Amino acid sequence: MGVWHGRSLRKPTGGRIRPHRKKRKFEMGNPPTETLVGEERKLKERRGMGGNVKKGLKFATHANVADPETGEVKCVRIEEVVKNPASQYYERHGVITKGAIIRTEIGLAKVTNRPGQEPVVNAVLIKEEEEEG
């Protein structure tokens, strides 16, 4: 079933609002793209306003991790999702969102972008003590 972002057909009191027109395509929405750690990188494409194509990341294998001390950015393999403050469900199922802490080849990193809306995972390297505290 589709997601609809139009106005509710009920008033706050529970009374009915009679629609003056049908639902329009531009009022349609999409379920969120929940990015997972996978064996192969996979994108999810969806239609945007004006026929544009929005790309989200469905499965991620690598992340661009920036080291704040040296200023270097490395493309490293993602091993697992350690913590996700967005939701316990996301943490349990290993969903990558902005703010999630992931374990990479070079250490723990905090995700700084929204991979469900951008086809890449960007992160900043953090110290082991910061994550535990």
UniProtKB/Swiss-Prot annotation:
Keywords: Ribonucleoprotein, Ribosomal protein. Residues 1-34 are annotated as: Disordered. The keyword Ribonucleoprotein applies. GO terms for molecular function: structural constituent of ribosome. InterPro entries: Ribosomal_eS8, Ribosomal_eS8_CS, Ribosomal_protein_eS8_arc, Ribosomal_Se8/biogenesis_NSA2. GO terms for cellular component: ribonucleoprotein complex; ribosome. It comes from the Archaea. One of its GO terms (biological process) is translation. The keyword Ribosomal protein applies. Disulfide bonds: none annotated. NCBIfam families: eS8. Belongs to the eukaryotic ribosomal protein eS8 family. Part of the 30S ribosomal subunit. This is Small ribosomal subunit protein eS8. The lineage of its organism: Archaea, Methanobacteriati, Methanobacteriota, Methanomada group, Methanopyri.
